[in-house]
Amino acid sequence: MEPSLLMWGFFTFTMIPGCMAGACVQQPPSLRNATFKILGYKVGTTLNCDCQRGFRRDPSSGPYMICRGNSSHSFWENKCQCMPTSSPRIPVKQVTPRPEEQKERKTTETQGQMQPPNQANLPGHCKEPPPWEHESLKRVYHFMEGQTVRYQCLPGFRDGSAQNNSAQSVCKKQEDQEVMRWTQPKLKCKSEKENGSFPEPQMSTAAPPTTKTSLPTRTKGTTDSQNLTEVPATMQPIIFTTQYQLAVAGCVLLLLSILLLSGLTWQRRR
């Protein structure tokens, strides 16, 4: 092994554990149908300088970036750089992510970390570190004690926990333990379609109103040019019953009989 690699391994072995003291090695908890955002990174937070497939970290840069400073001024120390893994003489082909990598990236963007568009200048905190060329699809942080992340439900979901401070997780030392762990957030994102949030339209059971038409009636002493008074009248259909038809037929027969008798009487008188 080359002496430079041995020295670099010794540096990594001696420096990184000191930087990781009092830090949460694991990433914040993942919640279903939710994402988390970070308003600022506490001083001492580190970010691994990971590269995409086909690239590796440039030996001239450090293995990670670290947030340095104090309550009045803070900044990211070191810059991550990636270089091709192949020889510089051979042109490097652009590596197309495999389907599983694209799926992993989509899942990370949906359920992973979401940065607010405008980060506040919190005392003793660094903003989101700048990106570097050919960096890995997923960033790996090592958060310090007291770091807080806040969760929120994805669009189409709402918080059903009904508890205060249920949407945050804090990096803190557990009781009777020396390691740092994240507290479990109690946020429960439920679909907005549950519990009748979107009521279905109900069918009306009321009877339809009676259809009425307004017939104009002319009042006494008015002309055609004057307003007509509208009187509501209910239109009822005319029904010819059997009794009515028999009465009409009887009247017709009686009239014919009278005419016939009158004709006979008139002939006899002649």
From Swiss-Prot:
Keywords: Disulfide bond, Glycoprotein, Immunity, Membrane, Receptor, Repeat, Signal, Sushi, Transmembrane, Transmembrane helix. This is Interleukin-2 receptor subunit alpha. Glycans are attached at residues 33, 70, 164, 195, 227. Residues 22-245 are extracellular. It is found in: Membrane. Residues 22-84, 124-191 form the Sushi domain. PROSITE patterns: SUSHI. Residues 87-124, 190-225 are annotated as: Disordered. The gene is IL2RA. The keyword Disulfide bond applies. Residues 98-108 have a biased composition (Basic and acidic residues). Residues 1-21 form the signal peptide. SUPFAM superfamilies: Complement control module/SCR domain. Disulfide bonds join 24-67, 49-80, 51-82, 126-171, 153-189. One of its GO terms (biological process) is immune system process. One of its GO terms (molecular function) is interleukin-2 binding. It comes from the Eukaryota. Residues 265-270 are cytoplasmic. One of its GO terms (cellular component) is membrane. The chain crosses the membrane at residues 246-264. Non-covalent dimer of an alpha and a beta subunit. IL2R exists in 3 different forms: a high affinity dimer, an intermediate affinity monomer (beta subunit), and a low affinity monomer (alpha subunit). The high and intermediate affinity forms also associate with a gamma subunit. It is a single-pass type I membrane protein. InterPro entries: IL-2_rcpt_alpha, Sushi/SCR/CCP_sf, Sushi_SCR_CCP_dom. Receptor for interleukin-2. The receptor is involved in the regulation of immune tolerance by controlling regulatory T cells (TREGs) activity. TREGs suppress the activation and expansion of autoreactive T-cells. Residues 112-121, 202-225 have a biased composition (Polar residues). The keyword DNA damage does not apply. It comes from Sus scrofa (Pig).
